[in-house]
Structure formats: C-alpha cells, structure tokens
Amino acid sequence: LDSKLRGTVVLNIGKTPGAGLAFYNRLQNTLSLTRVVARPDSMEAIRKRLLGSQRVIVVVTSDDYKKYKTMLDSLPADLPVIYVFLMPLKSMLDMEGYWKKAAAVVLGHTDESVIQEYVADVLVGKAVADGRLSVAVADLFKPGDGVTITPKVSRIYRPEDYGMDSKIL
C-alpha cells in the first residue's frame, strides 16, 4: 500500500466492535487511517464515510458481511477497495463479484491476532505473502495457486508457475 495516500478508511465487519482491531492497530503504525466499525443500523452513514475516502480496506472476520453487501455494491467503481478476509475461505464463496472488482484481496483464513498483524505487515511490505490456496477462489484462482517461500533460500521462478512455457521462451 502506498503510505503517501491519505484518506484510507478501514471498515471492520465482524460480530464484535473489537473484530479486526489487531489488524487496524498494526496498520496504523505505518499508514494514516480512520477506522469504522460496521453496524447494520448505520449503513447510510458508513457509505457516506467510505465515499469521502481515497481508499477503503474492508476487513471481514465473520459472515456478518452479508448484511453489508448492498452498501458495498453501491461504492463507486473508481474507489480502490481492498478486501481482507480473516475467516475460512469456504464461508465466503459468494463474494466472487467483489473479488473481481477489488484492488486487492487478502485471505488470512483466521482472525487470530498474530495473523491479523502479519497480514497488515504484508500490506505495507514489512512481511512477505507465503502459501498456496487449498481451495479454488471462484474462477479466479485454482487450488495450489500462490507462492511458497522458504526462508534463507533464493526464490526460483519457473515460467510454468505463471502460465508460460519455458520451452518457447
């Protein structure tokens, strides 16, 4: 994430007001942020707050996100929205349309504090993304897609990892 961009809003969607707080606190060390906790009774106020931002990071820690789908649909296409899912992938497979429109999608698979902090570090370049998907993500990615990083070992890239044929190159 570009640390020079001001006006970033983190929208936390979870079962409790503290959902996603470890992510926000870690990210706040590097970026200028505002945090908004999603509540079904304040949809219009939340939407207006998001429209006034330069970038939105939607942090989802429970299936409560389904209550907010209409509001998320109403965000302008030119507003960069990053989705951070801190819950099992299989519980959010109906989010395909959002993934396709997103500036970025990060799958953390759990809302444990240590994972929230690690994901925040990945977004600001303080940590590397590591791992492969265990399940398909709609028609965007298949199981096994991703990168596995072994510490202290140089990365070896093969054209086949990126859909190219090394025999042709």
PLM regions with names:
Residues 1-165:
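Preference for extracellular/luminal or secreted protein segments
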Residues 167-169:
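Short proline/glycine- and basic residue-enriched helix-capping loop/turn segments at helix->loop/beta transitions
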